[in-house]
Amino acid sequence: MFDKKLLESSELYDKRYRNFSTLIILPLFILLVGGVIFTFFAHKELTVISTGSIEPTKIVAKIQSTNANPIIENNLKEGEAVKENSLLLKYNGTPEQTQLSELLTQKKQALDKKVQLDLLQRSLTNEKNEFPTADSFGYEKSFENYEAQVKSLEATIQKSNQAVEDQNKSTESQKQAIQNQVATLQQAIQNYSEIENAVSSGGGVSQDNPYLSQYNSYQAQQATLEADLKNQKNPDETAKQAAKSQEESLKSQFLSGLASSKDSLKSQIQSFNVQESSLTGSNAYDNSQSSQILTLKSQALSASNKEMTDLNSTLTDLETKISLQKQDDQYSQVFAEQAGVLHVLPDILGMKKIPIGTPIAEIYPLLKSETQVNLTSYIPSTQISGMKVGQKVRFTVQQNLPQPEILTGIINQIDSAPTAFKEGNAYKVSATTTINAKDLPNIRYGLQGKTVTIIGKKTYFNYFLDKIMGRGNQ
């Protein structure tokens, strides 16, 4: 018989309800209910996926071809880091470079010559040699020649003045001798006049009169005549008259002799005066030494100033030619205007000749820590409607790396007009991000990867509902 007590045991219920159906259906039901509840609260990111690349935020410099001549040196390398003024291209322009080198050499020589010419002018102004070292342009020799001319002029004038001095001394000596002779003759005339006065007026004659002997002789003759008259006894009137006549004749002859002697002396004095007058025109000293040296100095300075003017004109002409030649020469070489990363345009690589004005390369900013770059992608026009400035973009580098390289940026620009491609129209979208130091080894300009743009969020319930209802394409 059946024992009803068995219905009250747990073993019965365990055997009755512990089966496959109860063990599977209940968990699945609970899971389904939980999943449905999850769809109401959990959100799904709505994304737009595309292919993008890393681009610079700005172009530091654009480089164009400056010459159509054959290229003899080409340093254009894609992705190469270049320094400012690095040589990128060199065209066949050797003749122009040679001419520029010659012009620069001429300029250096002209400047060196100007320095030496300035030393010459200083030497002339200061009247001493200002050349510290040997002069290769002959200006020191010119100053030495100037000094030699000055010394020669000084010697000539000194010699001339010495001759004048000697001549003047000789003239003075002759004049003094003549004056002494005239004084002697005048004294003789005075002595004769003294005797003449003594004879005529009975005056006395000094004992130091050199002609006293003549006067004494005259008096002796007079005394003889008087003695002869006295010796005559009772001389008659005729005898007296004869004696008196002899005395008068003797006196007259003596006075006539004195007068003749005085006239002779006066004639000699007149002759000496004529000689003295002929000696009065003595030569004057040459006092033109200072003015002649000044004239010589002025001539030398004037010549050097003219040469300095010509030299400055030559330098100006050379500067103009050098400037023009540098303009020509700069077109025979292309240099990097600024430091950065070189991007060579694809059509340029390998070309031997490039037409003038053809763009050949661009220089991007150097990639370093904290450098900003653009994450650039092209979004089909069918997916662009949900994209806005300020949305996040995730860029994943498509390379075999131990760990995926992911960059996150913010959209800062969406083109207002689409770009046409074979596959259709697409809008250019740029997002800005900052490179960290750890990202630098794996980052290059032009590197491609997958871009994921988060344009919004939906609950999973709404997401699946839209899918079922055919609304939206996300």
UniProtKB/Swiss-Prot annotation:
Disulfides per UniProt: none
Its job: Involved in the secretion of lactococcin A.
Keyword Lipid metabolism: no
Topological domains annotated Extracellular: 45-474
GO biological process terms held by the UniProt record: bacteriocin transport; protein secretion
Transmembrane stretches, start-end: 22-44
Record protein name field: Lactococcin A secretion protein LcnD
